[in-house]
Amino acid sequence: IFTSEQGSAFFGGKWTCYDTGVHAAAILRWPSKVAEGGVSDALLSYVDVVPTFVDLAGGNPAELDLDGKSFAALLLGKTKRHNEVVFSVNTTRGIYHGSEAFAIRSATDGRWLYVRNLHSDKKFQNVITHKEPIFASWKTIDTDFARSRVNAYIKRSAEELFDLRDDPWCLKNLAGKKETTKAQALLSRRMDA
């Protein structure tokens, strides 16, 4: 198995819980066991890797105190789904030019992404906001869109909800909208469970 550390390092990616920040690539090769050329959009999490290895080695992950669950059945072609919801966390603590802490939590079912910014009363900061000439140049662009992106990067709402089907870059926060109440409530409850 080979995986990337996180999603992209571009704006709205690394140091966030938006889809481009947590959607990581994974490649697996196991000749005669896993079908060659297969692709899956099943929801997996890094915490599922160890239980999977335990399972494939003949152990019983259920007997261990592990957070994840084995995706061996997915690898072996016995199912196409794995998790109904996956969770991500980012604290932005101890990073270069970062805030003392800026805790972010998210939950996704693959269609909807719910983000909870636990320090929404503070400005988000990191090396990009302090040293990157690209971010400084964005602040000079005098358009509504540019201003909204800069503001969204440094000032986060307490709750955010994105429709990943229509808005994969997580640009339009739908939290609190009447038409998305059900999705937001469901993912918020799952996060609290």
Pin down the residues of each PLM region.
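Metal-dependent active-site segment of extracytoplasmic phospho-/sulfohydrolases and closely related
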Residues: I1-F10, A57
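Structural recognition of the beta-strand scaffold that forms the well-ordered cores
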Residues: I1-T3, A26-L28, S45, T52, ...
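Substrate-binding rim/cap in mid-to-C-terminal beta-strand-loop elements of soluble/periplasmic
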Residues: F11-D65, K69-E84, K172
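C-terminal, low-complexity/hydrophilic appendages and adjacent surface loops
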Residues: Y18-D19, R93-G176, K182
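Low-complexity, Gly/Pro
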Residues: A25-I27, K178-A185, R189, A193
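A generic secondary-structure signal for well-formed alpha-helical elements
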Residues: P31, L56-P61, L75-T79, R111, ...
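A structural signal for well-ordered alpha-helical segments within the folded catalytic domains
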Residues: L44-P51, L66-K69, D109, R156-E159, ...
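Short, surface-exposed recognition loops and adjoining beta-strand edges that mediate ligand/DNA contacts
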Residues: L66-L74, V85-F102
